[in-house]
């Protein structure tokens, strides 16, 4: 199944390092980041999981839950946690899905649906496409997905930046420009005509082009 932005994130029930999880129930009324890993005890993924734990407070204050996924058993994944603590100085407190039968990886289009067997005997290279980040909104829709090569670690400060943009643009009729960071100027959406913009933004705006109007961050 091909997944696109604004599709409903497929629901599933799966085992994890914190027991059985129903994904939609687990998300609740907040946001979620699901990020996947091809195999336990792989070097790049170990640094990523540790970094997400270090950023736990940043995700929490944005009402965002994080959940990992690895194509392994619960025991294998659980045995990885101490290694992550040694490597990154932080042991993951968030759940990691043990996708033993690869069902979630297939459901989320990270592995071919016709792929047979279980995680047993598979290597990280067999699962190299299981390197995707999904951001899911309170409406359970996919807001973003990014797939990374095995040799490139993910930038979770960038994930937080994207979440800040989504939180702002979901509550104000604006968009965020290139390299935007929280607190910087934003762009009035082109669909908002000048007459409506005058009511929404009575302090006015800076016109770069008729289709590019900038205002201060309206959340400040």
Enumerate the predicted regions with their spans.
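Chalcogenol-based redox active-site neighborhoods
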Residues: 1-220
């Amino acid at each position: 199944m091909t997944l696109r932005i604004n599709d409903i994130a497929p629901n599933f029930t799966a085992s994890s390092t914190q027991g059985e999880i129903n994904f939609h129930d687990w998300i609740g009324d907040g946001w979620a980041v699901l990020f996947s890993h091809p195999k336990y005890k792989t070097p790049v993924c170990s640094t990523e999981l540790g970094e997400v734990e270090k950023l736990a407070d940043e995700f929490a204050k944005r009402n965002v839950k994080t959940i990992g996924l690895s194509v392994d058993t619960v025991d294998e994944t659980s045995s990885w946690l101490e290694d992550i603590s040694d490597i990154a100085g932080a042991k993951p407190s968030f759940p990691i899905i043990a996708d033993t039968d690869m069902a979630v990886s297939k459901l989320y289009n990270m592995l071919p649906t016709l792929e047979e067997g279980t995680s047993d005997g598979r290597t990280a290279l067999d699962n190299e496409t299981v390197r995707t980040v999904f951001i899911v909104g309170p409406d359970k829709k996919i807001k973003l997905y990014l797939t990374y090569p095995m040799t490139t670690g993910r930038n979770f400060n960038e994930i937080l930046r994207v979440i800040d943009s989504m939180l702002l643009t979901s509550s104000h009729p604006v968009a965020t420009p290139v390299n935007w960071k929280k607190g910087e100027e934003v762009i009035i959406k082109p669909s908002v005509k000048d007459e409506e913009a005058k009511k929404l933004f009575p302090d006015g705006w800076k016109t770069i082009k008729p289709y590019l109007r900038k205002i201060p961050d309206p959340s400040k």
